[in-house]
């Protein structure tokens, strides 16, 4: 009998499909319709099953050894089904967001906080309400004759003018404390010390050299270099062990030889020769010292034996980045590039990212130009896709001049180093796309089969799924008004699965963790954009599904943050990992969680109270773990506290906010929301102005908190986080809690009494007061406003902050 005529097809006699939600969550599915998992977390409406693809004959595929490279390739872990109904989401419903200021012209990436607030009508109404209430409160106190602008601490002079008023935190009695006798943890309670510390950061960042000659500048670099013995015996080994696995851009065998030559030259002539890159090499050494110092500083908090880092911590590296900036951007026009110059730009980019002094800006966007310069220099130097596409033996040819610096020896050594640098720059390019929605600077990718392996660890691994990340970029940026959400979710899921099978070693594990967290944050941003769009289109069923997904992913990300700050991990790499958790907590604490709370039904008091406590726990962790060291976080502490007070004290909060804004549109529509703003309030919030007689349906809180033991446990975990921080040492609890105006001696007793009692009379039903017209616009607006504010805040909590 001809065997080909009787091919046996493999048949399955059991159900093998699982619902799409369980597949995403990698959970065991009971195959119900809906399954118990989806029912438990409240997303049963999205519990869907995909039919199996037709089975293949068993003997139609031979052994693995018989397969060609193209047959071995697995194009997708999840098959793309052309039969799905395409669904499009507009991620810029209010248009692309530009900001023009004296200091910078900026188009914000679509997943920055600014763009999320611009896109989300609920959050935009909330933040506008907050701005108006605070501004009017301060205007009210100006009328009392108190000179608020005069109240500023001497230590704040290094901060921007917009930040000066935020430095007045302490009650008057704190002036008498002997700071030298405070315990380190207790000293954090004195918020003025934090402001003073951050002012020093900014002074170092804006360092002025006086005589700006090259000679003076080079002499300062030479003076800042560490002792050769300390550098070679302590700093370089520390960097190689803990930091180089994260930033594999230097070949230290040859680099150490160049260091010895540089120090010998300095000892003879005490000068630097830019023609042979000595100034650039010296600046690379300074940045290595800076990174090691930051690493040691954050490692000490989690290490038992701090003496291991003593020699590195004793270095003063605060001005090193300022010194390097001139060499990186000022001494030589960006027309040609060398290896040292490329390495210097990459390390400067890293220092901006991990530094506590806000090198990347409030929206994590200010290094985009520097990143573009890095990518352009890579392309100019040949550090590009060609290095991984082509064979080293037959397709790549390098000539090395005898005067080249540094001289690595053979062609293969250059190619190996260039490949690592290229993969690192590629990884960074895709990471920023995932975190902020920034369009990729590297506008190309390749699906390689088999994926090339060059013995470079994680640098090789990212090549396996880069085409998927680039696909996400294209789907978002081809037309942000019309994003195929099914295809976008498919690409994200496939990327997650590819990352999930990668092997990790000890010191590169944080790179994989960072990539996975970045992808989770991208998922969060995608789902949030869906929710905002469904609210605009009135699709209630899709709203419920998106809200449940957003809620679940939010508490999962929050749990990962709790885990990170509860375990030491690799202490020497916390300086690097802190940033990704800072970005996540910033997004959750300032945008996502307030938006979730504002959308919860008023009738669900238990769920609402639980999420307000969740926000308090998250804020305590965010500002205590990160806000004490990072300027970007510290600067957001005031708005974080006001957000919490609004959500904590406001019964029927969203209803009250909309009525307040509609009232403002009727009475003060032309008044600027903030200084220099010429836009009318009704133009800023067109959806709120759509019907001034009744609340728009899209602002009606209709959602319930998803149920289930897993979600409840994750919420409780975050609620209990605040117990870690003693009441008096919880920066989030104490900030603006005990603040007092420094009242001039000429202030009358009656004025002081009125200030002291301003926040004592509170009622629970804010919606009733805000909706009443008795105090209408005929001369009684001030009394109406102040009653509303008194119900929300103790004005002293923020009068001292503006």
Swiss-Prot record:
<dbReference type="Pfam" id="PF00172">
    <property type="entry name" value="Zn_clus"/>
</dbReference>
<keyword id="KW-0963">Cytoplasm</keyword>
<keyword id="KW-0238">DNA-binding</keyword>
<keyword id="KW-0678">Repressor</keyword>
<keyword id="KW-0862">Zinc</keyword>
<keyword id="KW-0804">Transcription</keyword>
<feature type="DNA-binding region" description="Zn(2)-C6 fungal-type">
    <location>
        <begin position="19"/>
        <end position="47"/>
    </location>
</feature>
<dbReference type="GO" id="GO:0008270">
    <property type="term" value="F:zinc ion binding"/>
</dbReference>
<dbReference type="InterPro" id="IPR036864">
    <property type="entry name" value="Zn2-C6_fun-type_DNA-bd_sf"/>
</dbReference>
<dbReference type="GO" id="GO:0005739">
    <property type="term" value="C:mitochondrion"/>
</dbReference>
<protein>
    <recommendedName>
        <fullName>Oleate activated transcription factor 3</fullName>
    </recommendedName>
</protein>
<keyword id="KW-0496">Mitochondrion</keyword>
<dbReference type="InterPro" id="IPR001138">
    <property type="entry name" value="Zn2Cys6_DnaBD"/>
</dbReference>
<comment type="similarity">
    <text>Belongs to the OAF3 family.</text>
</comment>
<dbReference type="GO" id="GO:0005634">
    <property type="term" value="C:nucleus"/>
</dbReference>
<keyword id="KW-0805">Transcription regulation</keyword>
<keyword id="KW-0539">Nucleus</keyword>
<dbReference type="InterPro" id="IPR050675">
    <property type="entry name" value="OAF3"/>
</dbReference>
<dbReference type="GO" id="GO:0000981">
    <property type="term" value="F:DNA-binding transcription factor activity, RNA polymerase II-specific"/>
</dbReference>
<feature type="region of interest" description="Disordered">
    <location>
        <begin position="749"/>
        <end position="779"/>
    </location>
</feature>
<feature type="compositionally biased region" description="Polar residues">
    <location>
        <begin position="749"/>
        <end position="768"/>
    </location>
</feature>
<dbReference type="GO" id="GO:0000978">
    <property type="term" value="F:RNA polymerase II cis-regulatory region sequence-specific DNA binding"/>
</dbReference>
<comment type="function">
    <text>Transcriptional inhibitor with a significantly increased number of target genes in response to oleate.</text>
</comment>
<dbReference type="GO" id="GO:0045944">
    <property type="term" value="P:positive regulation of transcription by RNA polymerase II"/>
</dbReference>
<keyword id="KW-0479">Metal-binding</keyword>
């Amino acid at each position: 009998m001809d065997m080909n005529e009787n091919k046996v097809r493999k048949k399955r006699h059991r159900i093998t499909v699982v619902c799409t939600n369980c597949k995403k969550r990698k959970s065991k599915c009971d195959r119900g319709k809906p399954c118990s998992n989806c029912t438990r977390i409240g997303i049963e409406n999205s519990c869907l099953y995909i039919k199996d693809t037709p089975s293949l004959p068993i003997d139609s595929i031979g052994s693995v050894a018989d397969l060609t490279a193209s047959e071995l390739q697995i194009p997708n872990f999840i098959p793309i089904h052309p039969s799905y109904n395409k669904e499009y989401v507009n991620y810029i419903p209010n248009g692309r967001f530009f900001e023009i200021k004296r200091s910078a012209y900026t188009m914000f990436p679509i997943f920055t906080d600014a763009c999320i607030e611009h896109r989300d009508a609920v959050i935009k109404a909330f933040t506008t309400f907050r701005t108006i209430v605070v501004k009017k409160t301060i205007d009210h106190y100006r009328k009392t004759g108190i000179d608020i602008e005069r109240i500023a601490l001497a230590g704040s002079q290094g901060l921007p003018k917009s930040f000066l008023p935020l430095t007045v935190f302490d009650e008057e009695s704190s002036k008498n404390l002997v700071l030298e006798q405070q315990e380190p943890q207790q000293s954090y309670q004195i918020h003025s010390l934090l402001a003073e510390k951050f002012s020093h950061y900014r002074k170092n960042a804006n360092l002025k050299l006086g005589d700006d000659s090259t000679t003076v500048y080079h002499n300062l670099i030479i003076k800042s270099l560490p002792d050769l013995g300390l550098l070679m015996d302590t700093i370089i080994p520390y960097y190689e062990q803990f930091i180089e696995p994260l930033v594999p851009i230097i070949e230290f065998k040859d680099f150490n030889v160049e260091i010895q030559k540089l120090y010998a030259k300095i000892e003879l002539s005490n000068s630097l020769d830019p023609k042979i890159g000595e100034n650039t090499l010296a600046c690379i050494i300074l940045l290595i010292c800076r990174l090691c110092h930051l690493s040691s500083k954050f490692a000490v908090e989690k290490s038992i034996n701090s003496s291991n880092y003593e020699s590195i911590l004793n270095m003063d590296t605060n001005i090193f980045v300022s010194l390097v900036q001139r060499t990186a951007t000022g001494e030589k026009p960006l027309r040609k590039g060398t290896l040292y110059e490329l390495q210097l730009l990459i390390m400067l980019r890293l220092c901006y990212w991990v530094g506590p002094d806000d090198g990347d800006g409030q929206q994590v966007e200010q290094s985009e130009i520097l990143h573009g310069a890095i990518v352009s220099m890579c392309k100019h130097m040949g550090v590009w896709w060609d290095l991984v596409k082509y064979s080293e033996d037959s397709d790549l040819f390098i000539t090395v001049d005898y005067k080249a610096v540094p001289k690595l020896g053979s062609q293969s050594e250059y190619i190996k180093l260039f490949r690592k640098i290229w993969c690192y720059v590629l990884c960074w390019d895709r990471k920023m796309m995932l975190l902020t929605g920034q369009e990729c600077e590297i506008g190309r990718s390749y699906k390689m089969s088999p994926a090339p392996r060059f013995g470079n660890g994680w640098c090789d691994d990212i090549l396996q799924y880069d085409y998927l990340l680039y696909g996400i970029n294209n789907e978002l940026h081809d037309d942000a008004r019309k994003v195929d959400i099914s295809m976008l979710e498919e690409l994200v899921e496939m990327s997650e699965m590819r990352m999930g099978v990668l092997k990790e070693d000890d010191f590169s594990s944080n790179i994989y963790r960072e990539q996975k967290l970045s992808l989770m944050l991208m998922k969060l941003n995608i789902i949030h954009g869906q929710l905002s769009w469904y609210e605009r289109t009135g699709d209630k069923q899709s709203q419920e599904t998106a809200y449940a997904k957003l809620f679940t992913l939010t508490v999962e990300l929050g749990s990962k943050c709790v885990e990170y700050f509860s375990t030491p991990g690799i202490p020497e790499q916390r300086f690097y990992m802190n940033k990704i958790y800072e970005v996540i907590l910033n997004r959750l604490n300032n945008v996502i969680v307030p938006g979730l709370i504002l959308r919860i039904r008023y009738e669900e008091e238990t769920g609402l109270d639980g999420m307000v406590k969740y926000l308090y726990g998250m804020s305590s962790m965010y500002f205590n773990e990160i806000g004490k060291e990072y300027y970007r976080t510290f600067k957001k502490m005031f708005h974080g506290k006001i957000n919490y007070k609004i959500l904590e004290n406001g019964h029927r909060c969203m209803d009250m906010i909309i009525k307040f804004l509609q009232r403002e549109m009727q009475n003060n529509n032309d008044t600027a929301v903030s200084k220099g703003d010429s836009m009318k309030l009704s133009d800023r919030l067109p959806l709120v102005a759509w019907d001034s007689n009744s609340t728009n349906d899209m602002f009606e809180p209709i959602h319930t908190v998803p149920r289930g033991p897993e979600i409840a446990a994750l919420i409780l975990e975050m609620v209990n986080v605040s117990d870690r921080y003693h009441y008096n040492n919880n920066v989030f609890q104490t900030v603006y809690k005990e603040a007092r105006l420094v009242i001039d001696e000429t202030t009358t007793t009656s004025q002081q009494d009125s200030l002291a009692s301003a926040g004592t009379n509170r009622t629970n039903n804010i919606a009733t007061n805000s909706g009443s017209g008795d105090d209408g616009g005929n001369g009684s607006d001030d009394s109406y406003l102040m009653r509303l504010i008194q119900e929300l805040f103790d004005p002293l909590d923020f009068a001292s902050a503006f």
